[in-house]
Amino acid sequence: MANKLIVTAAPHITSADSTQKIMQRVCIAMIPTLIASVIVFGINSLILTAITVAACVFFEAAYCKIMGREVAVDDFSAVVTGMLLAFNMPATLPWWMAVVGAFIAIVIVKQLFGGLGYNFANPAIVGRIALAMGFASAMSNYPKPANGIDALASATPLAVSGQLGASDYVTLLLGNHGGVLGETCAITLLLGGLYLIATKVISPVIPVTYLATVAVLSVISGRDPIVQLLSGGLMLGAFFMATDYVTSPTTNKGKIVFGLGLGIITCAIRFLGTMNEGVSFAILLMNLLVPYIEVNTRQDRLGIAKAKQGGAAK
């Protein structure tokens, strides 16, 4: 398959970081959350993650082989997709459902659209939504963590947010409550996100704008902003999924618009809809709007003065 050149808005910054190095850093950032999920939900968390990652790598290699493309599983992009997809599953999910999700994420969302760099949406997000729609009962069957507080034993914090107070903040930080693998331990997600920012893998603009928007709207609506920030998939989505290079804007203005949109949609679904969580749908909807955001936030041409009204530019 011939190499394609894609040019986004100038100016352009060159970097010695390869796709492989970037993806490896993302994997490193997710390891603390994986360890936390094993502590909270048991060894099945690790097994489910391993199966999902293996399935993603297999489908990527098999598809490329069948289509006569270069097999580039060593870039770790399929590993990242597999880990993110597993982080969006409960530890009790049957392994074959995880494989179905991996097929949807890698083959349908990523490879059928041209492979890495051409997918219209985050593959793991679409995989999660597809599984939630097709296997709703299994995807909402959250295991009871060890030593969890009664209100959060097997329910997500968002489902019982009205019962939570300041005394439960530590539980939300440590993740000792119901939920999917990668959404419970807020502190490891935050540490992973800070690592990605410190190593310049991601820009802080999208996650900061996203989280700030949710916090402000929570206060305006009379809800506890800390519970909203530490619950559900917000931390995972803000730092690891909304910042995907392919499906997020490249301009700073675009990133701010993107983050604002994510926060507004997430809160609209959480506060006004029938679903407790809205992060996945918010990211998917904003992924679809990225081309329009890019066009309308494109940087002005440098070195050319704007024409004055009634006269030509000098």
Which residues does each PLM region occupy?
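Long hydrophobic alpha-helical segments that form multi-pass transmembrane helix bundles
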Residues: 117-190
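Membrane-interface helix-loop-helix junctions at boundaries between adjacent transmembrane segments
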Residues: 74-78, 83-150
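Loop-to-transmembrane alpha-helix initiation sites
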Residues: 120, 124, 227-234, 254-258, ...
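Generic transmembrane alpha-helix motif of multi-pass integral membrane proteins
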Residues: 33-36, 81-90, 104, 189-196, ...
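C-terminal ends of transmembrane helices
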Residues: 58-70, 106-117, 189-199, 239-248
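Alpha-helical transmembrane segments in multi-pass membrane proteins
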Residues: 25-33, 48-60, 77-82, 86, ...
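Structural signature of hydrophobic alpha-helical transmembrane segments
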Residues: 42-55, 92-101, 172, 176-184, ...
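N-terminal signal-anchor module of multipass membrane proteins
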Residues: 1-53, 57, 306-314
